[in-house]
Amino acid sequence: MKHSVHFGAGNIGRGFIGEILFKNGFHIDFVDVNNQIIHALNEKGKYEIEIAQKGQSRIEVTNVAGINSKEHPEQVIEAIQKTDIITTAIGPNILPFIAELLAKGIEARRVAGNTQALDVMACENMIGGSQFLYQEVKKYLSPEGLTFADNYIGFPNAAVDRIVPTQSHEDSLFVMVEPFNEWVVETKRLKNPDLRLEDVHYEEDLEPFIERKLFSVNSGHATSAYIGAHYGAKTILEALQNPNIKSRIESVLAEIRSLLIAKWNFDKKELENYHKVIIERFENPFIVDEVSRVARTPIRKLGYNERFIRPIRELKELSLSYKNLLKTVGYAFDYRDVNDEESIRLGELLAKQSVKDVVIQVTGLDDQELIERIVEYI
C-alpha cells in the first residue's frame, strides 16, 4: 500500500486531504500535537466524513494512524523517510514550525539512500505555500541535504478549496464537509510526476487558479463574515439571507472578476458562473459556518499580499474599480471578537495609535492615496 504523511489532523486535514488520499489508496499517517485526536486515530484506525447536502451521504476513511510530533518526533522522521507523498493543512502561520522536522526527515532519506522522488504539498490558503515551506526547510538542511532535496524532493504549490466549518461532535474524528472540493497542483515543480492523484487537477501554471480561488472564495467568504458581523449575523448563511449583505458580496466579486479577467484572461461567463457557485456554497443550508470562524485573524487577512489588499493594489494599478473591497477592509478593521486574539490586538492598536499608522502597520502599504482611502472607511 502507498504511504502518505499528512501534517494537520484537523477538520480540513481529515475532511478534505485525508479523503482524497484515502480514495487514492494511501495509508495516512496524520501528524499533529492534539493528543486526543492522535489517540483516537490510533485506537480506531478509521473515521467518517459526512457530505453536507440533501441525503447527507457518509464516507468511511480507513488505514489511518496518528503521530504526536511533539512527543514522538522520531516517529515522524521515520515516516518521512519511507513515505510516498507529504501534504499539510495546518495554516500558513504554522508552516515554519514543521520545517525542522521535515528537514530531519529529508536528511534521513538521504542517509538511508532513499532516492525515490517525493513531493511535499502545502495545502494552505496562501499563494506559493509549498515554496514558502521549502525556504523554511532549507534553513535546517546540511549542504548535502540541500543537494539531495534539489534532486529528489519537490515542493509543488497547490490550491485547495473546500468549506469545512468549525464543528463539535461526540465522535472527535467525525467531520462534516460541503460537497464541493477542488485541489489543483502545479506540474512544473513536481519531482514525482508519475504519482498522479485522482480527483486532483494538475496545471503547468498554478498562479491563475490560486488567485482565482483566493481572490474569489477567500475574499468573498471573508467579506460575508466581516459585513455579516457588522450587521449582527452569527453564521455565513444568516449573513447571505440579508439582501443588503448579499448584494455587497456580489459587488466585491464583480470587482474581483474584473481583475481576474484583465490579468489572466479568464472567460467572463465561466467566471460569473464560478462566482455564482461560490454564493450558492455560502448559502448551503446543511452547513453551520460561524462568522467567528471565517472572520478570525483579521490582522493576517489584512496583510499586503492577502485577500483584500493584494487585489486592491492590483485593481488600482489597472485603473479598475475597488471601492467595494475598500469598504470591506473598513469592516475588517472594525471587527472585534473577545475570543480572537488578533481582533483584540487590532482594537488595542487603534486605541493607542493613529488610524493611519495602524493601517500602514497592518497592511504594509506605502501608497498614500490607498492608505487615506482605507482610513476614510474605518
From Swiss-Prot:
GO terms for molecular function: mannitol-1-phosphate 5-dehydrogenase activity. Keywords: NAD, Oxidoreductase. InterPro entries: 6-PGluconate_DH-like_C_sf (IPR008927), 6PGD_dom2 (IPR013328), Mannitol_1_phos_5_DH (IPR023028), Mannitol_DH (IPR000669), Mannitol_DH_C (IPR013118), Mannitol_DH_CS (IPR023027), Mannitol_DH_N (IPR013131), NAD(P)-bd_dom_sf (IPR036291). It comes from the Bacteria. NAD(+) binds at S4, V5, H6, F7, G8, A9, G10, N11, I12, G13, R14, G15. It is an enzyme of class 1 (oxidoreductase). GO terms for biological process: mannitol catabolic process. PROSITE patterns: MANNITOL_DHGENASE. It catalyses: D-mannitol 1-phosphate + NAD(+) = beta-D-fructose 6-phosphate + NADH + H(+). Signal peptide: none annotated. SUPFAM superfamilies: 6-phosphogluconate dehydrogenase C-terminal domain-like, NAD(P)-binding Rossmann-fold domains. Pfam families: Mannitol_dh (PF01232), Mannitol_dh_C (PF08125). Its EC number is 1.1.1.17. GO terms for cellular component: cytosol. HAMAP family: Mannitol_dehydrog. Belongs to the mannitol dehydrogenase family. NCBIfam families: PRK02318.1-3, PRK02318.2-5. PANTHER family: ALTRONATE OXIDOREDUCTASE-RELATED (PTHR30524:SF0), MANNITOL-1-PHOSPHATE 5-DEHYDROGENASE (PTHR30524). This is Mannitol-1-phosphate 5-dehydrogenase. It comes from Streptococcus pneumoniae (strain ATCC 700669 / Spain 23F-1). The gene is mtlD.
